[in-house]
Design a protein with these regions (language model features):
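Short amphipathic alpha-helix that is part of the acyltransferase structural core
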Residues: 1-39, 46, 50-54, 59, ...
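Acyl-donor-binding surface of acyltransferase catalytic domains
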Residues: 2, 100-172, 299-305
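A conserved beta-strand-loop-helix scaffold within acyl/acetyltransferase catalytic domains
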Residues: 23, 29-50, 55, 63-74, ...
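A structural microfeature
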Residues: 61, 148-151, 229-230
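A conserved beta-turn-beta hairpin within the catalytic core of GNAT-like acetyltransferases
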Residues: 68-80, 90, 109-112, 235-245, ...
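A short, internal acetyl-CoA/4′-phosphopantetheine-binding micro-motif in the GNAT/acyltransferase core
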Residues: 80-90, 119-122, 245-253, 282
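Conserved acetyl-CoA-binding loop-helix of GNAT-fold acetyltransferases
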Residues: 85, 91-104, 108, 247, ...
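Short hairpin/turn module used for nucleic-acid contact or packing/dimerization
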Residues: 253, 260-306
Length: 306
């Protein structure tokens, strides 16, 4: 026989034990405790979506959910941001019980679609890391349909080419200057960031909350003064992750993006990191060429209509 488990809403006082739990469960994420803190904060508006499973008074499982409001492009969506079950308590139905209860709560709140996918601007993963095989099996046996794949690339910061002096001098001669973001950039930079669409402006805003800001920009003189033409951020959601980044289409091919990328990775190396992850990677060849990045983690996204 297995010991019965009970489900209740998790509270702030549970956090120390929950950090220990996720560190044991998320074996492919060394910063699991930080991941929990990030997702816990994002669920603050609906704390009832933080559910804890206990056996004999000890935490053995956790789910953190969220509700995304309906938009012109998507229905109200329930998000399953995290499911973790202690290794010693797996295969007892705890994960399924937590998932079912979270689904019931977001459905009662109005969700007509469920997703297991990164929820920008503040997210921990693009989807389920396929190495968490039990999580993949749980999603697929619970009626979720696999969607797009997300890829991360890894960079060995100890050996990657991170020097930018010569390229910065070349760009400066062409009128493009690369520098770190500053607090004084906040208003004009975030106004410029809205042109990119999506949620990159939210991620960039978070980069500005750190001291020093975790981002770099490329600027040049325009008709109305200094204008931004490129940006890159790091450590926005997870300390070891890089992104987002973008360069004005008119300047692509000049090496602006490579300089911005290398500057951010140099920051991470200076902060004591040996490895960096490029999250939700798009142009694989660009990163492989620029910093010798290599393909690493694979994530599957899942959705289910209610």
């Amino acid at each position: 026989m297995t010991n019965p488990h009970s489900i209740r809403t998790a509270s702030e006082s549970d956090l120390p034990a929950l950090r220990t739990l996720v560190q044991a469960a998320l074996v492919h994420d060394q910063d699991a405790a930080d991941v929990l803190d990030l997702l816990w904060t994002q669920a603050a508006s609906r704390p009832q979506l933080r559910l804890l499973a206990e056996t004999d008074g000890q935490p053995v499982g956790l789910v953190v959910g969220a509700l995304g409001p309906a938009t012109a492009d998507a229905p109200a969506t329930g998000h399953i941001d995290l499911i973790a079950v202690h290794p010693q308590a797996q295969s007892r139905g705890i994960g399924r019980t937590l998932l079912t209860r979270a689904e019931e709560l977001v459905t009662a709140a109005g969700a007509t679609r469920l997703m297991m996918r990164g929820r920008p601007p503040y997210y921990a993963w693009p989807g389920i890391d396929i190495r968490y095989t039990r999580a993949v099996c749980l999603a697929e046996s619970s009626g979720y349909t696999r969607g797009r794949e997300g890829l991360n690339m890894g960079v060995d910061l100890r050996t990657a080419p991170l020097d930018t002096a010569a390229d910065e001098a070349r760009l400066a001669a062409a009128g493009v200057h690369v520098r770190r973001l500053t607090a004084q950039d906040e208003k004009p930079f975030l106004a410029w960031m809205t042109r990119w669409g999506g949620t990159w402006d939210g991620e960039a805003a978070r980069a500005l909350t750190y001291d020093p800001p975790r981002g770099h920009v490329a600027v040049r003189e325009g008709a109305d003064g200094v204008e931004y033409v490129g940006f890159a951020c790091h450590g926005v959601n997870r300390r070891s992750w890089f992104g987002p980044m973008g360069t004005d289409s008119a300047l692509r091919g000049m090496g602006v993006g490579t300089v911005l990328l290398r500057r951010c990775l140099a920051d991470q190396l200076a902060a004591g990191l040996d490895e960096a992850e490029i999250g939700w990677t798009g142009p694989v060849h660009f990163y492989a060429r620029g910093v010798e990045a290599r393909l690493g983690r694979v994530f599957w996204t899942y959705s289910k209509d209610i």
